[in-house]
Swiss-Prot record:
The keyword Manganese applies. Its EC number is 5.4.2.12. This is 2,3-bisphosphoglycerate-independent phosphoglycerate mutase. Binds 2 manganese ions per subunit. GO terms for biological process: glucose catabolic process; glycolytic process.
Length: 504
């Protein structure tokens, strides 16, 4: 084995006065890495990762930048720019949906995450769509997915109030359904959850019905459910998606709307329908899957000479390991949006625990991830290992401080086992993170469930577990990781990678 890249998802470096689970937890393995290795910090938010200034990073953005070896301009930024320069109004995919609704005398249905979190969506993009529909006298309907994960758990009322003002101003866009993202945006093949949102949107069947969207939220709060967990709710006197309608899904991040879009488009169904899905013109803000034959408003900028491709071209073997919650990140996103593995790229997916929220099992599948990595290193001896530990991020999102501490300590324990095996196999190690999360858990009264804009650690050690004589340069970001890995592999950095090695 030559080199391992270990990504501690959501392990940021922040102040200790915000219930910082990373600093509070006992982390002897990580502390030893910092003591013996060459270490520094990376900026992982805003323009450093291709996002608007001040915007927190996330796992998709982080892994795209890591794999590309360059700052990747994100779909969020591209949509913002299009709205600002007016090209949003002439976008082909958006206009195809609008024109279809006009031609069939149907409606256009907007659906996506109503949030200003900037991770999966931005509420102002929906506002721009409603304004455009109003200008063209198109009957628009909105299906709201509430956040509470990348935003405050009780913040959706303010977003709905603003949305209703936009709807009133432009005379279109009535809200037909409200679903928490736990249901509408599941990504771990919990099809029953996805089906509940689908049934509300298409079949107008749900456990709850209210007169207004705000009532849907307030009644959910009364039941003890925060924004993320609002059960799909129908709003009185509003329509379903029907034959001849158009649908536009406005999330710009793909992984958490794929399942619902698969249902709406009847793509390779892993379920059975009681009735056929309606025949619609379905378009999406970004490309959710390269196998979907759907109009895309902002298709991906193709990434070439990514880390995985360069490793494969050099004739080296690589192993990608994560549990299912982060599997797409160490494969699809790290490969620049490519679904298919490169030559000699082996992938191991470990099923994440079947629990409703990960504070119920903070260790998640970190032990199994480590077991698999150790077995594969000892039996197949890959040249490169890329592994993601999901716990700090996924448990951090629950807002449970005690559980987050347990998650951090679990990862630290597993990291010790993993490092021992890598060093024994002769491997160099880079340990880093893609963004912060567990480094700020808010307060007991007001838990913080979102990512942070804090820097993340970067640590390098040689096979002897030390980094003596090496230093990590200042001013680094995630785009510098791939050049660093290639330097350790003695593989030439391609021109497409504009980052530079972090090791001095």
């Amino acid at each position: 084995m030559q080199t391992a890249l270990v990504i501690l998802d959501g392990w940021g470096l922040g102040d200790h006065d915000r219930r910082n689970a990373v600093q509070t937890a006992s982390t002897p393995t990580f502390d030893r890495l910092i003591e013996k290795g060459a270490n520094g910090t990376l900026d992982v938010s805003g323009r450093q990762v291709g996002l608007p200034a001040g915007q927190m990073g996330n796992s998709e953005v982080g892994h795209l930048n890591i794999g590309a070896g360059q700052v990747v301009k994100q779909a969020y930024t591209r949509v913002e720019d299009a709205i600002d320069n007016g090209s949003f109004q002439t976008n082909a995919a958006i206009n195809a949906a609008f024109n279809h609704a006009v031609a069939t005398n149907g409606r256009v249905h907007f659906m996506g995450l109503l949030s200003d979190g900037g991770v999966h969506s931005e509420q102002e993009h929906l506002h721009a769509l409603i304004e455009l529909a109003g200008d063209r006298n198109i009957d628009a309907i909105t299906h709201v997915f509430t956040d509470g994960r990348d935003t405050n758990p009780h913040s959706s009322e303010q977003y709905l109030t603003t949305l209703e003002e936009v709807i009133h101003t432009h005379g279109t866009g009535d809200i037909a359904t409200v679903s928490g993202r736990y249901y509408a945006m599941d990504r771990d093949k919990n099809w029953t959850r996805t089906r509940m949102s689908y049934d509300a949107i298409v079949n107008r069947t749900a456990e709850h019905t209210t007169s207004t969207a705000l009532e849907a939220v307030s009644e959910s709060y009364d039941r003890g459910d925060t924004d993320e967990f609002i059960e799909p709710t129908l709003i009185d006197n509003t329509p379903a998606v029907e034959d001849g309608d158009a649908v536009f899904v406005f999330n710009f991040r793909p992984d958490r709307v794929r399942q619902l879009v698969r249902m709406l488009a009847d793509i390779d169904p892993a379920w059975s329908f009681e009735t056929d899905p309606p025949t619609t013109e379905l378009a999406t803000m970004a490309q959710y899957d390269e196998t979907f034959s759907l109009p895309v408003a902002f298709p991906p900028n193709e990434q070439h000479d990514t880390l995985g491709e360069v490793i494969a071209t050099a004739g080296l073997t690589q192993l990608r390991i994560a549990e299912s919650e982060k599997y797409a990140h160490v494969t699809y996103f790290l490969n620049g949006g490519r679904e298919i593995a490169f030559e000699d790229e082996r992938r191991e997916i470990i099923k994440s625990p079947d629990v409703s929220t990960y504070d119920q099992q903070p260790s998640m599948s970190s032990n199994e991830v480590t077991d698999t990595a150790i077995e594969q290193i000892n039996t197949t001896d890959p040249d490169v290992l890329i592994l993601n530990y999901a716990n700090p991020d996924m448990v951090g999102h629950t807002g449970d401080f005690t559980a987050a501490i347990e998650a951090i300590e679990s990862v630290d324990t597993q990291l010790d086992r993993l490092l021992e095996t890598i060093y024994a196999a002769g491997g160099h190690v880079i340990v880093t993170a893609d963004h912060g999360n567990a480094d700020n858990m808010g307060t007991a009264a007001n838990p913080h469930t979102a990512h942070t804009t804090n820097p993340v650690p970067i640590v390098y050690t040689r096979p002897d577990g030390n980094g003596d004589g090496d230093t990590i340069r200042d001013g680094g970001s995630l785009c510098d990781i791939a050049p660093t890995v290639l330097e350790l592999l003695s593989v030439e950095q391609p021109a497409a990678m504009t980052g530079s090695s972090l090791i001095e």
